Amino acid sequence: MGGTDSKLNFRKAVVQLTTKKTAVEATDDTFWDQFWSESSATISDVFTLIPASEIRALRDENPSNLATLCYKCVEKLHNATLTGCSNPSEQLSILNCVRLLTRFVPYIFEDPDWRGFFWSTVPGQEEESFHGGEETAEARSPLAQTLLSAVADLCFCPEFTVHPPKKTGPDQPEDLSSIDSCEYIWEAGVGFASSPPGNPQFDCSRTELLKLLLTCFSEAMYLPPTAENHSRPNKWLSFFSSAGNRHALPIFTSLLNLVCSYDPLGYGVPYNHLMFADYREPLVEVAAQLLVVLLDHDSMQPTPTTMNGTDAEHSFEEPPVDNLFCNYLSRIHREEDFYFILHGVANLLNNPLIQTYLPNSCKKVSFHQELLVLFWKMCDQNKKFLFYVLKSSDVLDILVPILFHLNDARSDQSRLGLMHIGVFILLLLSGERNFGVRLNKPYSVRVPMDIPVFTGTHADFLVIVFHKIITNGHQRLQPLFDCLLTIIVNVSPYLKSLSMVAANKLLHLLEAFSTPWFLFSNATNHHLVFFLLEIFNNIIQYQFDGNSHLVYAIIRKRNIFHQLANLPTDPATVQKPRRRLASQGSDKDAQASGSEGEEKRPGTSTSAAESLPEMSADMSVKEVRNPASESETSDVEARSPGEATPPSTPGTSRIERKAIGRSASVTSSGSFVATPEWVQSWKQKLPLQTIMRMLQVLVPQVEKICIDKGLTDESEIIKFLQHGTLVGLLPVPHPILIRKYQANSGTQMWFRTYMWGIIYLRNIDPPIWYDTDVKLFEIQRV
């Protein structure tokens, strides 16, 4: 279809198919062959020449012709697995069938009455045409299984998708069912040592086959996001990830190795991506997407597996279906394989951060969201890999790009999904002690970010970015505040030397969160204060030595803690924020309508990811208490949440407090009414004893030395605090409490929605799912 005449002929065939009032016989090869016998086809031609309206008309008004077209395409693919497709014209015919199915399958999923079509056996005359009248296993198999088996076979078809073997005898058509596909894995890496020579044509054919597989698995897009709809197995994925797919292992290793071995920089020649076409990147991108989809299957099945690998304590009528892809991932155990995976993913995640003197001289990849989901799946389903990631400072090569993307996306409503996945990866990592230990490594890499310049460790970097998200992020991020502070709480017992920047920013967050206006505006806002106090207590109890900056900052801001201890509980003060909200309600409505009009102005679009449900609302956290005796002083340093703001320049603080207050007012419940009894119920539980005792001991000492020696320089005071001790003066150290992420149905549903939202948005060439009636998430267009 590359030439004008071939496009015209193809278009005429489409018109004939969609306008015929009678069914076209499956045996009319002259008619059907014109859909795939043209040369120089491109998938863009197929999508352009078959508009959505005509596909729906064919489906609704002449369903038998649509069914026969699908039968004939699958037949063509199946026959190719029996005879091979070494001939270029045969290969083009196969690709045209693949493109037709990729175009039509979403519209079959769109109609509930058609979803079972591929799971029916080939009826009547079509069966005789399909299998030559022979009674075979395929003849009794649903059409979907025949299609998936054929595509899997074609993924390892010599001279089409893989290099042919060296032959000693005469060339003969090769039955793909006799091929050992483990010898044809696409790339070296896990389970395969030799790297086949690159071939752009093979990469293009592989890409189109994988896109068809992805399309076949996308039925979930057309189901509303309810647990009932998604608790039933996806038959396509169930078969492809079962023992019925004899190529499951080579497909898994091919996909994984493709992603982890991809180097977008090549030989490092500047602007090489502008001079040479990169056929590998589209393949790597769809490989990452397909791998994530295959690893997601069964995550919401009736008998899920928990994070620690034990079966959930529930019984269901349907037995669980083994997912070979999850099984293969969980069984990877060699350190060289872990090294290959971790460094491959880290290399790609760090690609957008590369700085060069020549602008745009390096190729930048943009599938970081798929990589983050894939990394999550790896850590979630292979605990040995998670422990390997955390046992060295290599985990910081994952942390830095995650923080980069979090900071970059914090104000963009369309990237809320990216914010959630990044935060939840860090929450998962923070549940392990080694993550906190690794944060002590000095931060020397300078990433292009709009954060203050600082000298410190990766922990400082973490807190600076978190502070920026909380004080300067989109208002819909407030449900993530708990998660952000939980991460800092988890690592705080191991933070040996907070910088002054970090200390000031943590104190600034406490100052903002502890105002009566914020505390009394919402039923859960006081939890943030508890988290911050727990951070301070952990550092004071377990890492007092070396944290003189934080101690000094607490002394300077001691009035915050005194105000918390004396928080008013009288009705007038408690209900003042609500009266203020009521009095400003009309003004806020006017401002909201104006800002909404500005935000949704013509020419902007809202992505699918924007409509994703809030993830943190469904988060399960498992609390793990470590005895104080087991708590070692680890090599970790906390990062400050933002640039240091001296008390003498409160302008920035006012702006940031205003931002936090805005978030509080937006999320405050209209039915919530703070009462003195409610305030008293949690006020008496505020963990202030350790901090108050420290202030009671150190404040007089600091005041005395300042008077006696006439000290005015804070560095001298900090030096004095460095040599101080509180041994025997503080309460008995409390047990370290680690809050670990635990999967549940809500977060699993969120991950599935987010994953398919990414795939929908990323696949625009061709636009596989565009203009179809997607139900899993909301598509807003302008």
Model regions and ranges:
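Eukaryotic scaffolding regions of large macromolecular assemblies
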Residues: 400-403, 410-782
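Compositionally biased, low-hydrophobicity segments enriched in charged and small polar residues
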Residues: 4-9, 177-179, 183, 394-398, ...
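Generic structural signal of hydrophobic/aromatic residues within well-ordered alpha-helices
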Residues: 13-14, 31-35, 46, 73, ...
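N-terminal alpha-helical scaffolding segments that mark the starts
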Residues: 1-117, 678-685, 689-697, 701-712, ...
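Intrinsically disordered, low-complexity boundary segments flanking structured domains
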Residues: 17-20, 55, 132-133, 137, ...
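Alpha-helical repeat/alpha-solenoid scaffolds of the HEAT/ARM/MIF4G superfamily
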Residues: 37, 88-91, 95, 102-449
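Ordered, helix-dominated protein-protein interaction surfaces in large eukaryotic regulatory proteins
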Residues: 3, 37-38, 48, 79, ...
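Short, mixed-charge, low-aromatic patches
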Residues: 23-26, 30, 49-56, 354-361, ...
